[in-house]
């Protein structure tokens, strides 16, 4: 009998040991730490901050440069951390589950806690880049070096997801073609303006600084006013600053407008007599764009912007 008990005891102990080992294995797998990718295949990527050895297939990416979050999500990359602005983008609704809010994107400590295997930052983040490089491979990206389509292709090349980029681009081209037909029929050759206010300052945007400009002027081929073309498209950083008195010279037949940020001060611009006397205002052709949603230029945001622009100009 004692012999039987010993056998049963040994068997029971073995089962406990197996269960414990299985639990440990599941625990490490669910954590998905960056150590999993330390032995993964890497390659040298030429970034703005030099040559960086990064994993070929990153598993835990922290996107500190908020404008690039949607690019990585489109490419199916697991993003574990992103700045607060990302969570305010209406076009990301339902697309930030499981992503940690890292605040204003400057906290190195929050990044450490996320144990990333790749970090994406702006080139303007300066001294922080050196600190971040000690945590994980860090790639600095210059905001205006590439347009949104070329940037998507570059991130796809970086992460080995070219197939997903091409799939999205094919889908995007079809959406643009369908929208272009509808919009051209509705507005013809009439002019379109994109404006934002920051206090009393008024900014008029061209095709290369977000705010839906690439969609309106490049993809859809809609017309800008003469001065918008001269000051915000053919020269400058993609926008120009104007005074209230100059507003009528830049205003198109249709205007997409809004404050610089949600709840921001418009400096009384939209209540001024100059604004109210614009033809677009009097004809009901002013459309209020979401300042955060239209700040982003990634594929997810572009799809939302295209839908808003199409609905606005064809209703």
From Swiss-Prot:
Q: What is its main location?
A: membrane
Q: Work out whether the entry's keyword set contains Electron transport.
A: no
Cellular component GO terms held in the UniProt record:
membrane raft; outer membrane-bounded periplasmic space; plasma membrane
Q: Which SUPFAM superfamilies match?
A: Helical backbone' metal receptor
Outline the extent of the Fe/B12 periplasmic-binding domain: 60-315
What is an annotated GO biological process for this record, any one? iron coordination entity transport
Q: Where is the lipid attached (S-diacylglycerol cysteine)?
A: 24
Q: Give lipid-anchored residues (N-palmitoyl cysteine).
A: 24
Family listed:
Belongs to the bacterial solute-binding protein 8 family.
* Listed name of the protein: Iron(3+)-hydroxamate-binding protein FhuD
Q: Which organism is it from?
A: Bacillus subtilis (strain 168)
Q: Tell me the lineage of the source organism.
A: Bacteria, Bacillati, Bacillota, Bacilli, Bacillales
């Amino acid at each position: 009998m004692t012999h039987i008990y010993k056998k049963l005891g040994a068997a029971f102990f073995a089962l406990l040991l197996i269960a414990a080992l299985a639990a440990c294995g599941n625990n490490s797998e669910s954590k998905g730490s960056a150590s999993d990718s330390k032995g993964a295949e890497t390659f040298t990527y030429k970034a703005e901050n030099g040559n960086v050895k990064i994993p070929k297939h990153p598993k835990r990416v922290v996107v500190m440069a908020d404008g690039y979050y949607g690019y990585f999500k489109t490419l199916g990359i697991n993003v574990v951390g992103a700045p607060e602005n990302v969570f305010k983008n209406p076009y990301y609704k339902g697309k930030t589950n499981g992503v940690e809010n890292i605040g204003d994107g400057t906290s190195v400590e929050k990044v450490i806690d996320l144990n990333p295997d790749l970090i994406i930052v702006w080139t303007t983040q300066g001294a922080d880049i050196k600190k971040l490089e000690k945590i994980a491979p860090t790639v600095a990206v210059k905001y205006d070096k590439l347009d949104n389509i070329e940037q998507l292709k570059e991130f796809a090349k970086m992460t080995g997801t070219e197939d997903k980029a091409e799939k999205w681009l094919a889908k995007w081209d079809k959406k643009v073609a369908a929208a272009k037909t509808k919009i051209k029929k509705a507005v013809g050759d009439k002019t379109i303006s994109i404006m934002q206010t920051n206090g009393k300052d008024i900014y008029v945007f061209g095709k290369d600084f977000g705010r839906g400009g690439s969609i309106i002027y490049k993809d859809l081929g809609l017309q800008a006013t003469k001065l918008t073309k001269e000051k915000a498209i053919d020269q400058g950083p993609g926008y120009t600053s104007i005074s209230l008195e100059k507003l009528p010279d830049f205003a198109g037949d249709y205007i997409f407008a809004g404050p610089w940020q949600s709840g921001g001060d418009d400096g009384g611009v939209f209540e001024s007599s100059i604004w109210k006397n614009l033809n677009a205002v009097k004809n009901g052709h002013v459309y209020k764009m979401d300042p955060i949603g239209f700040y982003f230029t990634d594929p997810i945001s572009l799809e939302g912007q295209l839908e808003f622009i199409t609905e606005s100009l064809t209703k």
